[in-house]
Amino acid sequence: MAGNTIGQLFRVTTFGESHGLALGCIVDGVPPGIPLTEADLQHDLDRRRPGTSRYTTQRREPDQVKILSGVFDGVTTGTSIGLLIENTDQRSQDYSAIKDVFRPGHADYTYEQKYGLRDYRGGGRSSARETAMRVAAGAIAKKYLAEKFGIEIRGCLTQMGDIPLEIKDWRQVELNPFFCPDADKLDALDELMRALKKEGDSIGAKVTVMASGVPAGLGEPVFDRLDADIAHALMSINAVKGVEIGEGFNVVALRGSQNRDEITAQGFQSNHAGGILGGISSGQHIVAHMALKPTSSITVPGRTINRAGEEVEMITKGRHDPCVGIRAVPIAEAMLAIVLMDHLLRHRAQNADVKTEIPRW
């Protein structure tokens, strides 16, 4: 199976399945001499970890990460960093009924069409369980970006179903289980989640991720534009069906005089572009949004077929998230960090000596 690696200089390769013995990843390209411990990675893993609230799957995985290589005496050595997380709470028997049945809306049908077989236990490689390793690798990138460049990456839920969430206070994001920046909407979110659990249904969501302190100049035209790589990274997250950079699809209703980010001696006057112009960072906040579909793992009966092509009724068993967008917030942060880390290393390799006299803000 190809397609398990992202990045050019900062490269992350993940492996493992939902109900396998463990998940792991290899992180290449980390500069030497960076202080790094397992505790540095654990914080974000705990934010993504299942079973931490009544609103997410009750699969209880400690997600304790182990650093296997690439760190000596508490600092990175410049060699490959190996990371491992053991699976401890698999209930594979929950999936025995779908061994020969294709769950609608899942990768069961397409995986078997491609490979001629599939791991039906929790979706195998197609499960979002794999994203734990992205978060671990992304934590390395977030640490480097923050300490060396002052770059801060943060994300939040900005819509669940038909409930829009305004970014009122970033401090609120870590104070509630929804990663919600709008405290006034917490009761509405709770009511929606309770209704979904009662109905056995699910709902979609929108997640916003932002990076501040990013220097101007990151991005490689034309096929490795920074926004293209960010979109690629976010679209690779399970259940993501759409990505917007900056104003995104809202630009359709705008005129050029409204959308252009005018510049004065004090700097840019707006940021409709999301901090990227011509595929290269402008020095403004980088802003991206992603839409996540409602999970198909629901107890509402639905039609599908078995491997013999016979129509059957399907009710999903197991432990699942009514809204996968909630735990996607730290995953989105990780993927943005991985892309920015890669582009910073690439920019430094080619353009470290470039000096310009034009203003920076």
Swiss-Prot record:
Cofactor note: Reduced FMN (FMNH(2)).
Pathway: Metabolic intermediate biosynthesis; chorismate biosynthesis; chorismate from D-erythrose 4-phosphate and phosphoenolpyruvate: step 7/7
Keywords in alphabetical order: Amino-acid biosynthesis, Aromatic amino acid biosynthesis, FAD, Flavoprotein, FMN, Lyase, NADP
SUPFAM superfamilies in the cross-refs: Chorismate synthase, AroC (SSF103263)
Coiled-coil spans in chain: none
Binding residues annotated for FMN, in chain numbering: 125-127, 238-239, 278, 293-297, 319
One GO cellular component term noted in the UniProt record for this chain: cytosol
Annotated EC: 4.2.3.5
Cofactor: FMNH2
PROSITE patterns, sorted: CHORISMATE_SYNTHASE_1, CHORISMATE_SYNTHASE_2, CHORISMATE_SYNTHASE_3
Molecular function (Gene Ontology), one example: FMN binding
InterPro entries: Chorismate_synth, Chorismate_synth_AroC_sf, Chorismate_synthase_CS
Catalytic activity: 5-O-(1-carboxyvinyl)-3-phosphoshikimate = chorismate + phosphate
Superkingdom: Bacteria
Residues where NADP(+) binds: 48, 54
Biological process (GO), any one: amino acid biosynthetic process
Family the UniProt entry places it in: Belongs to the chorismate synthase family.
Quaternary structure note: Homotetramer.
Stated role: This reaction introduces a second double bond into the aromatic ring system.
Name this polypeptide is given: Chorismate synthase
Top-level taxonomy: Bacteria, Pseudomonadati, Pseudomonadota, Gammaproteobacteria, Enterobacterales
Gene name of this polypeptide: aroC
